């Protein structure tokens, strides 16, 4: 066996080992990302347009399972409240226990005397003015919730006289919405609003969904790349072998 042949065989064995490692690592990342996502996230279909334009009617969203104590102002949450309806609902948290809420002087939602910028509203001034909220204090352990489509949302403003100032218990929260999964033209992560960041407690950090997506995509690339190595290497080997045979035949 010539030195060139031994070198080629060595390269082939090393390539096969690396290919196997790539496929194995890719499977771990790909499956791990999916399993991690299934544990952390729950898909929901939003039946109404009360969260438009952020989330449209019929949109499929991905919501991270969290405890109610983790909720911050600005979060879009999935919750169940029997006095509001039988199905899970999706609204934005604008006030937490101890907050003083009112709306809408100068067309602005006010929390603890601070005007809140709400760039997610479709009609800034009009939407806010349409939502009249008398000065209301949120009881401890409870949340004040509004839809982004203020003129067409059955939220805390529709339940101000129901008791607890129209608020919902933190324990009613099932998950926090991180992304829109469907339709494709709306696909993507939801931005955390900055308007509440200056208030005590700030806003929540994004969930691990982005890392999960990176793990799944990276795993898929490694699996496909590793699986493709074998056929590519064999084809290259045949070409080298054919070239070597021609050179040997030409010597004489």
Where are these regions (language model features)?
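Soluble "head" domains of membrane/secretory-pathway proteins
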Residues: 2-30, 37-45, 53, 57, ...
């Amino acid at each position: 066996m010539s030195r060139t042949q031994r070198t080629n065989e060595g390269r082939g064995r090393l390539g096969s080992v690396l290919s196997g490692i790539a496929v194995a690592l890719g499977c771990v990342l790909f499956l791990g990302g999916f399993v991690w996502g299934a544990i952390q996230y729950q898909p929901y279909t939003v039946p109404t347009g009360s969260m438009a334009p952020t989330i449209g009617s019929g949109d499929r969203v991905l919501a991270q399972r969290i405890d109610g104590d983790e909720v911050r102002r600005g979060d879009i949450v999935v919750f169940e409240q029997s006095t509001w309806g039988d199905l899970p609902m999706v609204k934005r948290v604008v006030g937490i226990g101890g907050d003083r809420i009112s709306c809408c002087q100068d067309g602005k939602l006010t929390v603890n005397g601070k005007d809140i910028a709400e760039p997610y509203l479709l009609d800034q001034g009009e939407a806010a003015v349409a939502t009249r909220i008398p000065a209301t204090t949120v009881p401890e352990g409870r949340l004040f919730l509004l839809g982004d489509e203020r003129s067409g949302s059955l939220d805390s403003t529709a339940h101000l006289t129901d008791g607890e100032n129209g608020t919902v218990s933190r324990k009613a929260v099932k998950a926090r919405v991180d992304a829109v999964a469907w339709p494709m033209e709306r696909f993507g992560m939801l931005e955390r609003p900055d308007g509440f960041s200056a208030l005590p407690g700030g806003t929540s950090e994004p969930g691990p969904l982005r890392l999960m997506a990176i793990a799944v995509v990276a795993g898929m690339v490694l699996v496909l790349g590793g699986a493709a190595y074998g056929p590519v290497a064999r084809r290259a080997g045949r070409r080298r072998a054919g070239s070597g045979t021609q050179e040997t035949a030409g010597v004489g």
